[in-house]
């Protein structure tokens, strides 16, 4: 069988003494991929992306999976991906990952017509920047996010009277949209450019973060045609088709969906809500490495 590396992190791999509370999502992905890939003569093997002893040439391809610590080791991560790419097929590509790893990619997409939530970009937030952000965005409820990060790590929801927390990293600032609590966040999963499935993610009562770590829940949905069209329009802004993509969106005041994130690095792809995910990925990888 052709071995396919599924890149993980130490804290998501089974048996880790410091395993993350959301590592069950890693297990679900592995369960979804193993059988469909085996039907095409491929064996999916989960590995630690930091394992310097691995010979990447033994794999027919490497898929970035639950590398959920890369933002704390960004340069090492990108360098490792470039080495992997020299030895085998890498999905998604190192260039795409490097571009997508900095939230500035959203500015690039906006120039190509993507509909975004209004955003400020601040390299180091001081008190002056903090206070002016509320005026510039005409909101008393803002969300501050790391420009390199994921999963609400280092994220703050603040008002103008709040104390300024330590934000040592470059930040992006957006108005908090009540729809995240009233309706939820939509995720659309695409494999090799084809729509696979969609879901609605909702936060637990009293919170706004929709990740499972914070008590968020997911429900599979059949998206209305206009919502799906809005998600597909985001993918069309890319020059190349990624193996996998998750488009995270929030409904704006006009009823249309706005892009929150285009996840092309290590997104959880929700195989429970999309039982056909594994087969679609196996077919796509087989075509690409043939």
State where each predicted segment sits.
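Phosphate-binding site of ATP-dependent enzymes
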Residues: 151-239, 258
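ATP-dependent carboxylate activation and anion-phosphoryl transfer catalytic cores
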Residues: 225-290
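Active-site nucleotide/adenylate-binding loops and adjacent lid/helix of ATP-dependent enzymes
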Residues: 2-8, 81-87, 94-183, 225-229, ...
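Short secondary-structure junctions
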Residues: 42, 114-115, 138, 238-243
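Flexible, active-site-proximal loop/turn residues at the rims of small-molecule/cofactor binding pockets
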Residues: 68, 125, 268
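A short, local hydrophobic-aromatic micro-motif
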Residues: 45, 117-118, 174, 245, ...
């Amino acid at each position: 069988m052709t071995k396919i590396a599924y890149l993980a992190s130490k804290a998501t791999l089974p048996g880790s003494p410091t395993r993350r509370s959301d590592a069950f999502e890693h297990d679900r992905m592995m369960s979804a991929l193993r059988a469909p890939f085996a039907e095409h003569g491929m064996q999916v093997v989960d590995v630690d992306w930091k394992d310097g002893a691995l010979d990447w040439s033994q794999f027919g391809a490497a898929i970035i999976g639950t590398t959920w610590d890369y933002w704390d080791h960004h340069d090492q991560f990108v360098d490792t991906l470039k080495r992997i790419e020299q030895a085998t097929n890498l999905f998604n590509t190192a260039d795409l990952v490097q571009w997508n790893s900095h939230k500035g990619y959203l500015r690039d997409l906006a120039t190509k017509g993507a509909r975004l939530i209004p955003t400020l970009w601040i390299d180091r937030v001081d008190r002056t920047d903090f206070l002016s952000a509320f005026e510039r965005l005409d909101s008393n409820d803002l969300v501050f996010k790391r420009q390199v990060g994921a999963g609400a790590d280092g994220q703050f929801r603040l008002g103008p009277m709040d104390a300024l927390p330590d934000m040592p990293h470059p930040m992006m600032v957006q108005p908090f949209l009540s729809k995240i609590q009233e309706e939820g966040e939509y995720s659309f999963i695409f494999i090799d450019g084809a729509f696979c499935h969609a879901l609605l993610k909702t936060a637990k009562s009293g919170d706004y973060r929709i990740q499972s770590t914070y008590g968020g829940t997911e429900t599979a949905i059949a998206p209305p045609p206009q919502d799906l069209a809005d998600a597909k329009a985001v993918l069309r802004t890319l020059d190349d088709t990624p193996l996998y993509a998750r488009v995270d969106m929030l409904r704006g005041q006009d009823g249309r969906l706005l892009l929150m994130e285009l996840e092309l690095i290590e997104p959880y792809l929700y195989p429970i809500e999309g039982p056909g995910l594994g087969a679609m990925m196996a077919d796509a990888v087989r075509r690409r490495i043939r």
